[in-house]
Amino acid sequence: GTEGGDGGPLRGDTLVRSYINRLRSVTTTPISNYKDDPIYLSNFGVMTELDGSLSIDTLKFSDYFKSNPSDFAALTKNRVTSGNALIQATGTGSLYKAGTYDLSLTSSDNRQSFTAATLDGAAMVLENGTFKGDSTNTLGINIVAASGAPDTRIFIGNSLISSLREFSKSVLTPGNAIDNKISTYSDE
């Protein structure tokens, strides 16, 4: 129904409430796996008002963006990064899973070159100087370690846009749960 009016047949429905709650949580749910600390939409000045609408404090956005420009990727772009500048981490395809994974490197010459690596506790495949992820979580992750590189963490982050896209897909795909609810009410 309209604001303040009688609700329709889906008013109070648990599925509809769960969709609304998921959308409302956008401003409070941390965006993880981009760096050691999570990134919040509120860091960029995005706030939920009492009526449920969103607003942006442009000064807070500008200040945070100036001091943390790479954090903006958490809103717009899926990203694979390393916790150390001596290690280049990239992702190909879409089989790898968002997460923060420990990378361990093996060297027999005081870390001048590397003969083996594990990521997410699984051995990586070494191919032409590139270590390739070979576990369920890291398939498609490529690591190139420069001389002197330490063990570190690899961050695989799913952006806010990507998360919203997945949510939209689950809600809008034909035959989804909400279609089934509507069809049930239409049949009655």
How does the language model describe each region?
Residues G1, P9-D187:
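Bacterial flagellar/type III secretion structural subunits and associated motility module proteins
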